[in-house]
Every structure is written in C-alpha cells, then in structure tokens.
Design a protein with these regions (language model features):
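Long, internal scaffold/assembly segments composed of regular secondary structure
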Residues: 1-24
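Start-of-helix register in tetratricopeptide repeats
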Residues: 3-4, 37, 70, 103-104
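"A position-specific structural signal for the A-helix of alpha-solenoid helical repeats
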Residues: 7-8, 41, 74, 105-111
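TPR/TPR-like alpha-solenoid repeats
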Residues: 12, 45, 78, 111, ...
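TPR/TPR-like (Sel1-like) alpha-helical repeat modules
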Residues: 17-37, 96-102, 113-137
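Alpha-helical adaptor scaffolds
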Residues: 24-98
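Juxtamembrane/interface motifs at transmembrane-helix termini
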Residues: 26, 44, 109-110, 141-146
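Intrinsically disordered, low-complexity, charge-biased linker/tail regions
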Residues: 36-41, 52-74, 123-197
Length: 197
C-alpha cells in the first residue's frame, strides 16, 4: 500500500462528501502502515468536527497503550487539541523515556505548559528535543518536507521522497579528500623546478 496514493484517494473521497469511503480506506492503510499522516487525515476526515470528536475518532483505530510511537504521537496531538492532558500524557508515556525523539519531547513540552503551566518543565522538554533523535519525515536528496511530493525539488527525480529518519549533519568538519591517506611525516611533493638542468 502506497501511503501518498492512499492519502490522495482519501482526500478525493472527502471532497466528494464520501467520508465513509475515505475513513474505510484510511483504517485499512493505518492497519497496514501505522503512518502518522494517515492518522492525521483520519482524525480530520469529517470537516467541522470538534477536537473532542477527532480524539474519539482516533480512539477507534488506536488502542491504549499505543502500539508504536507514531500512534502515541497522533493520539497525544489530538488529546492536546482537545485539552485532554491526561490522555495526552498516557499516550506518550511509553515513548517519553531517555530515548524520546524530537517530536515526543516537543509534545511533552506542550503538555507540561498546557496542563500545569510549568515553564521550567516545558523548557526542560524543549532542551531534550534539541538533543533528541529526529523523527521520520519525507526526505529526498537531503531535503525534508512536511508532506510527500512527487518530484524532488533538488534534482527533479520522480518519486524521490522516502519516509525515513533524516540524515543528521556531523558537527565535526570532514577532512578534505586525500588528506587521510598521507602519513603525517611524509614530505609534500615539490613541483619540478622550471630551470633544472
């Protein structure tokens, strides 16, 4: 199942007023992939639905405790929007340990600020988010996009975007090519003298 194609098909159903068809398709794709974009569209499939309705709708496809991080983050986002801080915290609890990703840490900061107003704890989570591993995203040729695109804007390659954890840059400057191969004591080659006889 190709997630971007399924999302496009579901949006077409929604725009035609065929919400049931869209939700059926999204449920099937969610079970197969667990992709966060599918959960987000499923939650927003009914135009005009309240935040509480969106949270309830996600509860139809995601059980507690969430089976994986993407499910927990989707539930937490919907719960934060509905001001249901307890549900948001429960959804992220299995993923908010020492290996929390940037997305989980950012959501935890929102929960701390929204539920308790504790700026110190919120800043602590934001500081963790800066150092945390990145979440998967649509990437192509080193570019990160919020959503899948059919063509890479960098190279023009068709179907270049992949759902994966973006490559992080090393803080260390790489050595220029060829430098590592020379021993430290080796004399540098000199150019031949122009007037050598």
């Amino acid at each position: 199942d190709f997630v971007p194609a399924a999302l496009i098909a579901a949006r077409i159903h929604i725009n035609r007023g065929e919400t049931r068809k869209a939700m059926s398709l999204l449920r099937r794709i969610w079970r197969a992939t667990g992709h966060p974009d599918v959960a987000a569209l499923y939650a927003h499939a009914q135009p005009g639905a309240s935040a509480v309705d969106r949270l309830r709708r996600l509860g139809e496809i995601i059980e507690m405790p969430p089976p994986h991080r993407a499910a927990g983050m989707a539930l937490a986002r919907a719960a934060i929007d509905a001001y249901d801080w307890q549900s948001a915290r429960q959804a992220l609890a299995p993923f908010a340990g020492s290996d929390a990703t940037q997305g989980v840490a950012s959501l935890m900061a929102e929960i701390e600020e929204g539920e308790t107003g504790d700026q110190g704890k919120a800043r602590e989570w934001l500081a963790r988010a800066v150092r945390a591993p990145r979440d998967p995203a649509w990437t192509a040729d080193g570019l990160v996009s919020d959503e899948w695109e059919p063509v890479s804007p960098v190279t023009g390659k068709l179907d270049a975007f992949e759902w994966k954890v973006p490559v992080t840059l090393s803080a260390r400057n790489p050595e220029p090519p060829g430098v590592a191969q020379l021993p430290a004591e080796a004399p540098l080659p000199l150019a031949p003298a122009a007037n050598a006889t």
